[in-house]
Design a protein with these regions (language model features):
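An alpha-helical repeat/solenoid feature that recognizes helix-turn-helix modules
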Residues: 25-41, 52-84, 98-137, 141-348, ...
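Bacterial N-terminal signal peptides that target proteins for export
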Residues: 1-12
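Bacterial N-terminal signal peptides
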Residues: 10-20
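Intrinsically disordered, low-complexity peptide-like regions
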Residues: 3, 17, 23-26, 97
């Protein structure tokens, strides 16, 4: 998602604030009040920037508007009858296609997934109910499973694409697209025992630095974190990370080897997806991801990225951070510096970064 603007940056932050405030037992009174003030300013900013057609910027598609709707509906005083939300829902539904996708011409998976999550918040709207069912089916059809791959041969369980989802019907799968798909299927009530969840777990595990990774366990740093994708692109089946490679000593030979480094936003995305799929909390993959999170706990940057890029994806990182830890359910995280109240820390970081007009802007060039 490279086409994000000021409104989207603000909305990613607002979503995280909503998640933090929804976990009331994780916030003390001071931080609850601080969060409410930030949210009020954010909503005012949104209300003054909605387009006449009900959208908040039509590019790169209706997903941005759906993010706004999701954030607004997290507030107890706002429902689908709110005039801003009602106009936005009308716009989102106008982007529904016959095949079940919801988009404006590009980024079909991202747009459909985020719109499905938003529509799932709406009750007693027949048009939304129809769109939800069709969007679920579309996303499940987009997932790589048995369709022909780039070489024309059917994808099987041992293929690096298996279980993942990419930007479009024939797109190379990655952790980001896949986690948004899982988020949408979870939000719209799909049973976690559905084959779509189970297939996704295969792909997600193959992006993690754990012994259970049966495909790439020897090329990812075995620290429990996640890389971006199992392949570089559809023509290059080498794995890909947005971080970099590092040299470590091989655990068996003791000789130095170059391995792919894991990083923050994808690790929280993978951890969250495991929880949505209802993996056992003591599953070694879940434990490894949780331990990575504790070891690399920070809200100052997207941990694991190179120094020059460490602020890239910061607001995306905040979103996955908040959603994942909210799904985990604990109010604190064990870190090398002791227990941290993650929701309080998140509110502090967002309150400090909020602009006077209620928006947020990342100092780095990429959201």
């Amino acid at each position: 998602m490279h086409l994000m603007n000021r409104s989207v940056l603000m909305l990613l932050s607002m979503l995280v604030l909503s998640i933090a405030t929804s976990a009331a037992n994780a916030l003390d009174d001071e931080h609850w009040d601080k969060a409410q003030k930030c949210i009020a300013k954010a909503i005012t900013f949104l209300q003054t920037t909605q387009a006449d057609d009900g959208s908040w910027t039509s590019q790169p598609g209706p997903a941005i508007t759906a993010l706004v709707v999701n954030g607004m509906l997290d507030q107890p005083e706002i429902d689908a009858t709110d005039p801003y939300v009602a106009r936005a829902l009308k716009y989102i539904l106008s982007q529904c296609k016959e095949d079940g996708s919801i988009h404006g011409g590009i980024l079909q998976n991202y747009n459909t997934s985020i719109c499905l999550s938003a529509l799932s918040r709406v009750n007693n709207m027949p048009q939304a109910a129809t769109a939800i069912a069709k969007a679920q089916a579309y996303l499940k059809g987009m997932q790589w499973k048995d369709q022909p791959g780039p070489d024309g041969k059917p994808i099987t369980t041992n293929h690096p694409f298996y279980g993942g989802s990419g930007y479009g019907k024939h797109g190379r799968p990655d952790m980001s697209n896949t986690q948004f798909m899982i988020q949408a299927l979870h939000d719209s009530g799909l049973n976690c025992n559905d084959p779509a969840f189970q297939r996704a777990m295969v792909f997600i595990t193959r992006c993690q630095g754990v012994a259970q990774n049966d495909l790439l366990g020897d090329v990812i740093v075995p620290d429990g974190g996640f890389i971006y994708a199992t392949t570089t692109d559809k023509d290059n089946l080498e794995p890909s990370t947005k971080s970099d490679s590092i040299t470590v000593d091989d655990k068996d030979t003791g000789k130095p080897v170059s391995l792919l480094r894991t990083y923050g936003s994808m690790t929280y995305a993978g951890f969250k997806s495991y929880l949505y799929a209802n993996l056992d909390r003591n599953d070694p993959r879940v434990t490894a991801a949780r331990e990575w999170i504790g070891k690399h706990y920070t809200l100052d940057c997207n941990p694991g990225l190179p120094e020059a890029q460490k602020l890239q994806g910061l607001f995306y990182y905040y979103m996955t951070f908040g959603r994942a830890l909210n799904a985990w359910g604990a109010t604190t995280i064990d870190t090398p510096d002791g227990e941290r109240d993650w929701a309080n820390d998140l509110v502090d970081a967002l309150a400090k970064a909020q602009q006077k007009d209620g928006s947020w802007v990342n100092a780095a060039s990429r959201w």
